[in-house]
Curated annotation (Swiss-Prot):
Gene3D superfamilies associated with the record: Transferase(Phosphotransferase) domain 1
GO terms under cellular component: cytoplasm; plasmodesma
Subcellular location: Cytoplasm; Cell junction, Plasmodesma
Tissue specificity statement from the Swiss-Prot or TrEMBL entry: Expressed in flowers.
GO molecular function, one term: protein serine/threonine kinase activity
The reaction(s) this protein catalyses: L-seryl-[protein] + ATP = O-phospho-L-seryl-[protein] + ADP + H(+); L-threonyl-[protein] + ATP = O-phospho-L-threonyl-[protein] + ADP + H(+)
Region feature Disordered, mapped onto this chain: 311-450
Principal cellular location given in the protein's record: cytoplasm
Segments of skewed composition (Basic and acidic residues): 328-342
Organism of this sequence: Arabidopsis thaliana (Mouse-ear cress)
Top-level division of the source organism's lineage: Eukaryota
Lineage start: Eukaryota, Viridiplantae, Streptophyta, Embryophyta, Tracheophyta
Record gene name: CKL1
EC number: 2.7.11.1
Name of the protein in question: Casein kinase 1-like protein 1
Keyword DNA repair recorded: no
Length: 450
């Protein structure tokens, strides 16, 4: 007899595991919808699934928050049934040879700030923001960023009175040392400013490929955290952001200027990145680096490459051959008091090269390759010519930004325009031929629940 949980969910193959238990692919026996099922032994030393399920319930309905289908106890296990999601940003970062373009980073930043703002609006801090804890959706939501893993979240204010928790010092490090804020390293109680600083480190990690305090050697875990802290404190914002647009330094300066109980101006942070996005001449079309790479691979292989494996409320897709040391065990830069709640299973997608610094030249469909969104590159130019897909993730501000990018209505500067000429004509001819050729492009939906 096939194993079931909650009398309506079929337990399938294991797709991941972690210190808290196992992650399985599940199916709703009534609708045949694929889901993620987390199992945690009721006798585990640090139970977190019940707490996490309560937070998911509080956050239900928010954009980019996985839906919880069921929580309960089956035999010796706590069980959480929730949406099946796509690969994590760490997976996709690895897939793109560990570097993302400015365009991709800015499109992600807009959604990620929104997710953190929503989390804070519900009176909670995440306290463990990292690329592994942001996942992309599947199917029609493949361009939407989801936030997951609330095991270390903490309520920072009273939900009714909004009375903030008191300032405290001598706190142990909670979260992942690589992305922890300076104040967290210094033992100061975390607040909203610290989540945002962690997000800034994630963005620089995507742009640079690594952070200055990675790869430091030490004898013990405690010494490791101390070395990371020393390096982080000694690395100025200007040094960290050198070679990249000044908006990133402005982001960090703003985060570090906040007092302990200040409410951040999330709109300001989104605005500086949106204005940069417009000045660069980008189109808000949801064509990410991995979208282009996946399309390029589909053109080079027959049959086309399979999509990245779907994941659970924790990600389960990782292209083979990619080493990502100490992302889960905590031995390198993980959690000092609680092991990460995930391990990853291999995906099936190979990466043939890093396209982060290459001009974009192809297109994509909604799941990974939107058929009506593509780039056409003119000779010697990195300017984009884009037909924008009508099926977008409607997170706040995207339509406004798209309209501004079309009209050039920007508060800080004007988009430079290429002069017409043979290069432009060549671009248009190439664009038209690609549009004709891509109309019939089919991508397998075998892993998509929708």
């Amino acid at each position: 007899m096939e194993p079931r949980v909650g009398n309506k969910f079929r337990l399938g193959r294991k797709i991941g595991s972690g210190s808290f238990g196992e992650i399985y692919l599940g199916t709703n026996i009534h609708t045949n919808e694929e889901l993620a099922i987390k199992l945690e032994n009721v006798k585990t030393k640090h139970p977190q699934l019940l707490y996490e399920s309560k937070l998911y319930r509080i956050l239900q309905g928010g954009t980019g928050v996985p839906n919880v289908k069921w929580f309960g106890v089956e035999g010796d296990y706590n069980v959480l049934v929730m949406d099946l999601l796509g690969p994590s940003l760490e997976d996709l970062f690895n897939f793109c040879s560990r570097k993302l373009s400015l365009k991709s980073v800015l499109m992600l930043a807009d959604q990620m700030i929104n997710r953190v703002e929503f989390f804070h609006s519900k009176s909670f801090l995440h306290r463990d923001l990292k690329p592994d804890n942001f996942l992309m959706g599947l199917g029609r939501r493949a361009n939407q960023v989801y936030i997951i893993d609330f095991g270390l979240a903490k309520k920072y204010r009273d939900s009714t009175t909004h009375q903030h928790i008191p300032y405290r010092e001598n706190k142990n490090l909670t979260g992942t040392a690589r992305y922890a804020s300076m104040n967290t390293h210094l033992g100061i109680e975390q607040s909203r400013r610290d989540d945002l600083e962690s997000l800034g480190y994630i963005l620089m990690y995507f742009l640079k490929g690594s952070l200055p305090w990675q790869g430091l050697k030490a004898g013990t875990k405690k010494q490791k955290y101390e070395r990371i802290s020393e390096k982080k404190v000694s690395t100025s914002i200007e040094a960290l952001c050198r070679g990249y647009p000044s908006e990133f330094a402005s982001y960090f300066h703003y985060c570090r200027s906040l007092r302990f109980d200040d409410k951040p101006d999330y709109a300001y942070l989104k605005r500086i990145f949106r204005d940069l996005f417009i000045r660069e001449g980008f189109q808000f079309d949801y064509v990410f680096d991995w979208t282009i790479l996946k399309y390029q691979q589909s053109q080079l292989t027959a049959p086309p490459s399979r999509a990245l494996n779907p994941a659970v409320g924790t990600s389960a897709a990782l292209p083979p051959g990619i080493s990502n040391i100490d992302r889960y065990t905590g031995e390198e830069e993980g959690r000092p008091h609680m092991e990460s709640s995930r391990r990853r299973v291999s995906g099936a997608l190979d990466n043939s090269g890093n396209i982060s610094n290459q001009p974009t030249s192809s297109s994509a469909r909604d799941s990974m390759i939107p058929s009506s969104s593509l780039f056409a590159q003119s000779a010697g130019s990195s300017r984009r010519v884009t037909a924008v897909s009508g099926s977008r993730d409607n997170f706040p501000g995207s339509e406004e930004l798209l309209q501004r990018s079309r009209t050039g209505d920007v508060s800080r500067g004007v988009i430079p325009r290429n002069s017409p000429g043979e290069a432009g004509k060549s671009t248009r001819r190439h664009y038209e031929s690609v549009v004709k050729g891509i109309d019939n492009l089919q991508v397998s939906d075998e892993h998509h629940p929708h």
